[in-house]
Amino acid sequence: MNNRLALNISALFFAFFVVFVLLFFTKDRLFEYYFTYLESLKKTVELQSDLESGKIVLFGSSELVFYPNQKFLPQNFFNNDLKIPLRVQGNEGHQSFVILSQLAAFDNKKVRENAKVVVLLSPSWFTGSSDNGLTMAKFLEYMNLGMMNKLYFEGQTQDKYKFLISDYIQNNISYIKEPTFIYETPYKDIKDEYINNKIKKFIIEKFDEKYVKSQDIKYFKQDLNFNDLKNEAKNIEISSSNNNLGINNEYYSKYIEPQIAKNNFPFEIVIPPSLEKNEEYQDFLDLLDFLDSYKIKPLFIMQDLHPYVFSKNRENANLLMETIKSKVLEHNFEYMDMWTYKKEDYEIGTLTDIVHFGELGWVKANQKIVDYFVK
C-alpha cells in the first residue's frame, strides 16, 4: 500500500514538473500568442454571442448593403420599427463557403441548440462561369485571424469541415499577400501539435468567458398586418417614370438603357456546364450538410432575377433553381421560393433593380422570417 501511494505521489509530482517545464519554455510564445490575437478575437465576439443567444442572424450578400435606406430592409425594419432583435451578416460576394466557415468557427452546443439562421440565396451566385464560388478576398474579410483561431483550436465542428476550409486556403494561397502562420500552414500539420493546440484552446476559452455574453433572446408574436405593409411598400417605392419594369430610374438609365442601345437586351442567364463543375453549388451542398446538426432548422430564401430583363435561357436557370430547392427540402429545412419562372408570376416592385429586393420584396421576406421564427 505504501509503495503504491509513493508511486502515485511520484507520478503526480512528475506530471507537475512536466507542466512546469512546458510552461517555462513556452510562456513567451503563449504571451505573444495571446496579445497578438486578442484584438482579432474581439472581432468574433458579437456574432458568436448572437448565434448562442438565439438572435435571428440573417446571412446574405449585396442586397443587405446596396440600398441602405430602404424602410423594410431587415436591419432597419426589425430593429427600428418592430424592436425585434435581428443581425445581418454579409455584403457583396458573401456566399455559401464563407457562411459555412463562420458557422464552423463558432460550432458548439449552445449554437447548435439556439441559433436561428436565415440564408438569403441569390440566383446570381450559382450562375455565370464554373468558378463562381467565393473569392479569397471575401474569405479573408470574414475569416480573420481570430476566426481562424476559433475554427482550428476551439470550434467543435467535425474535422472534415476544418480540412475543407484548410484545403480552400491552400488552393488559393497565392492570393494572400504575406500569409501568416495560420493561413500558410495546412490544418493537417497544425492538428499534430497537440500540446500547443490544447494551450491555445484554453486561452481562447478564457477569452470567451470574459468577452462572450450570450443571454437567451425570446421572441413573442406580434400583431402585424402584412397586407397593409405591402401596400405601404408599394407607396414608398419611387415610381419608375422612365420604364414600366419597376426598375428605379437611376439604375435603368445607367445600366439598362445603354445595353438596349447596343442591342444587348434582354439579358441571357449563363449556366455552368454541369452541377459537378459549379463551385458555388458544391459549396452550397457542404453548407446544407453542416446545418443538419442545428436543432432549429434554418430558413433559406431564394431571391429572383428580373424575368423581364433576364429572359434568355430562363428555362435552364429554372431547372437549376428547382434543383437547389429540392436539396434544401431534402434536409427538411424551410424554403421560401421568390424565384419566378414566368413573367406573369412576377409582381412589379418586388425588385428595385434587376437582382436586389425593392420594398415590396423585403416585406414578403420579412413576413416569412416573422412567421417562421417569431411564434
Kindly label every feature range from the protein language model.
Residues 140-285:
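Secreted/periplasmic serine-hydrolase-like ester/acetyl group-modifying domain
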Residues 64-158:
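Membrane-embedded segments
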Residues 25-46:
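Alpha-helical transmembrane signal-anchor/signal-peptide segments
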Residues 7-28:
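Hydrophobic membrane-insertion alpha-helices, especially the h-region
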Residues 42-68:
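Short extracytoplasmic
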Residues 305-337:
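Substrate-gating cap/lid alpha-helix
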